[in-house]
Amino acid sequence: MPATDFQGSFGRSLLSLRRDQVDSSTVVSGSSSHHEPSTMEVELDSFQRQVAEKFIDLNASSNDLLSLEWIGKLLDSFLCCQEEFRAIVFNHRSQISKSPMDRLISDYFERSIKALDVCNAIRDGIEQIRQWEKLADIVISALDSHRPIGEGQLRRAKKALIDLAIGMLDEKDHPSGTNLAHRNRSFGRVKDSHHRSIGHFRSLSWSVSRSWSASKQLQALASNLATPRPNDVVASNGLAVPVYTMTSVLLFVMWVLVAAIPCQDRGLQVNFFVPRHFQWAAPVMSLHDKIVEESKRRDRKNCCGLLKEIDRIEKSSRLMNELIDSIHFPLNDDKEVEVKQRVDELVQVREALRNGLDPFERKVREVFHRIVRSRTESLDSL
């Protein structure tokens, strides 16, 4: 669906919904006064439109869907939405403490705490990918184009390729990968200044445990997530809508991270659906459907992560492994040229990982700390 198509499928805005409510009341009362949108209504509608525009942009770049660069853009979009949502909560904090907003905002922050464990699990997955990068380095070094290729070099490359293939097995087939999760510390140990946050969040102390399940965590994040009831929208002066919006965006972002990056007990079976009358529903559901289709591809069904770079390194290393198996000595010129070509391909994949993982990890860390800060500020202000 082209990005321009979403412009016509924005759905009904918060302002139009509010106008309908006002029009209904004026018909009952017999009044014909024209309703002018308040500053608050304009602010809340602007937030809905911003979320929609962010996801329209992500659809426009969906040729790079699930690449490190694309997921980085998704995280940037989340951070922008989170900052706008934080401003809305701060600007209307007097209403946040009243019913039904006290219940709705508390529910949002409870879900956001669950997202912290997902961020920690993704950090573990990044470390796992770095181990694969090191194994690719061994293969590249062993088959260096500046030296003649001998049997010893092939054996060294072959061993690294076998280790890489084993490491890239889905953890259901190879559960030893979960050792990373037990060993790594979480983002929250970087600074001690957020002492109150550390007291509030167990997720800040250590990374996820060996028994932790990404699939179950996503299900917990999605549990009982429902569109705001009309009476809650009215009683909260519309504030229930951005809370639902931000909760849905949070769930979608965490779902994408689990889909893309290796982590314990991956699973994408989450009931995620947004009614089309929300401005941002069409672009979000379009991305959701594309990712589900990608996960159903025959060659991706049992992979450890849908990240584009993982697919590339898996294919490149498999082709290299098959080539090495076909080599007999003495090595003829054609085979030597073919080996060099495969090495060059592996170098490109390795460089993509090397250049992309660090910025990606920094963004995941920023998401983690932004969620913590938002929750802490809420505790301080309520």
Swiss-Prot record:
Effects seen without this gene: No visible phenotype. Longer hypocotyls and greater fresh weight. Greater production of lateral roots due to increased lateral root primordium initiation and associated with a stronger auxin signal in stage I lateral root primordia where PIN1 and PIN3 accumulates abnormally, as a result of defective PIN-FORMED (PIN) auxin efflux carrier proteins exocytosis. Strongly inhibited by the auxin influx inhibitor 2-naphthoxyacetic acid (2-NOA); this impact is partially eliminated by the auxin efflux inhibitor N-naphthylphthalamic acid (NPA).
Any one GO cellular component localisation term in the record: cytoplasm
Superkingdom classification of source: Eukaryota
Transmembrane segments: 241-261
Protein location: Cell membrane; Cytoplasm; Nucleus; Vesicle
Pfam family, one: ROH1-like
Example of a GO biological process term: response to brassinosteroid
Xref: InterPro entries: ROH1-like
Key word Transmembrane helix present: yes
Main location group: membrane
Induction: Rapidly induced by cold.
Membrane protein topology class: Single-pass membrane protein
Stated family: Belongs to the ROH1 family.
Known role: Together with TRANSTHYRETIN-LIKE protein (TTL), prevents plant growth and development, but by opposition to TTL, regulates positively cold tolerance, probably in a brassinosteroid (BR) and allantoin-dependent manner. Controls lateral root initiation by modulating exocytic vesicular trafficking-mediated PIN-FORMED (PIN, e.g. PIN1 and PIN3) auxin efflux carrier proteins recycling, thus influencing polar auxin efflux transport in lateral root primordia.
Assembly behavior: Interacts with GRF6/14-3-3lambda via its N-terminal region. Binds to TTL. Associates to the exocyst at the plasma membrane and in small vesicles; binds directly to SEC3A, SEC5A, SEC6, SEC10, SEC15B, EXO70B1, EXO70C1, EXO70E1, EXO70F1 AND EXO84B.
Name of the protein in question: Protein BYPASS1-LIKE
Origin species: Arabidopsis thaliana
Gene that encodes it: B1L
